[in-house]
Amino acid sequence: KPGLRYEQTIQRVKYIVGPGENFHTNFSDLVPSVSLGMKIGKTQNIRAGYNMRIWRPGIWNLNPYFDDQNPMFISQGNPDLKSEKSHAFDVAYSSFSAKFNVNVSLRHSFNNNGIERISRLITAEDGEDFGGGHIAPHGALYSTYDNIGKNRNTGLSLYLNWNASPKTRIYVNGRGSYTDMKSEAQGLHNYGWNGSFYGGIQHTLPLKLRLSLNGGGSTPYISLQGKGSGYQYYGLSLNRSFLKEDRLSVNLYCNNIFEKYRSYNNHTEGANFVSKSSSKWPSRSFGVSVSYRIGELKASVKKAARSISNDDVKGGGGGGNAGGGGGQ
């Protein structure tokens, strides 16, 4: 089954108050895809396919604002960035039954114009002039973005859902991949393994109480000039529905209850520098949520198969030492 679609995104950014440089972008992309499927039993099938995935630069990547709040760690976006085009080939196996749902997928993707964050040390004794009265002093670390990455990624993912009993459900979602990244223009090369895991248990207790326990984590991610932080999390929730047709739901939850703060570390290397940063953010949370459902969805009303999702924006960015320019 072949497919082809056209996508266009137009952005116009204008500063009304405060310093900043107005900019606009226009992204136009043709996105092809091909998929093949074959059933090998009543509940099993194999699928193979190719698709192009478009990653458009986010506002932090594009914003040319010269962020020198910390004069020794300066960041600036690049409004001339192009869409990152990633080509992916995958083979997947799935099996479904009343007890088990399994999906295993092998995927290889590559791109030759990856949007990468590039950092370099200002070595000129008098600093470096970036125009508009913006000068980075000697010894400062200057970071921006460019379409310079050549990325190769091969990964294996697994999803398993087990209905252990009429009242108990156990699910696991895991992924492992190997990434090779390089920029010949900058003379940079990095590679490594990355993995993530997510799982949980849901159990229905007496009095229509639903207990959920979930957790997961990831190993450090690989970037062109270093690596970032891994993470782990866990949570517990207790849910109960009330009133006719269970319209009112009350949920008690707690997350990372034994961890008040979490540290995030970043390691970046260049030809003449090594930069390490660490930050702490609140991790523990707990609370109560209440929701009430108004109206009724009739069985004859078909729900929309898809909804608009803005999931094609390149991740990363932020203020200060973490990302591109952020207007003030």
For each feature predicted by the language model, list its residue ranges.
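Surface-exposed extracellular loop regions of Gram-negative outer-membrane beta-barrel proteins
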Residues: 1-20, 27-33, 37, 42-87, 108-138, 162, 255-271, ...
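Residues on the lipid-exposed face of transmembrane beta-strands in outer-membrane beta-barrel proteins
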Residues: 6, 34-38, 91-95, 106, ...
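Transmembrane beta-strands of outer-membrane beta-barrel pores
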Residues: 6-12, 50-56, 65, 95-97, ...
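Repeated loop/turn-to-beta-strand initiation elements of outer-membrane beta-barrel proteins
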Residues: 43-46, 99-102, 166-170, 207-213, ...
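Outer membrane beta-barrel strand-and-loop segments of large Gram-negative receptors
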Residues: 76-78, 82, 97, 101-173, ...
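C-terminal beta-signal and adjacent terminal beta-strands/loops
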Residues: 242-328
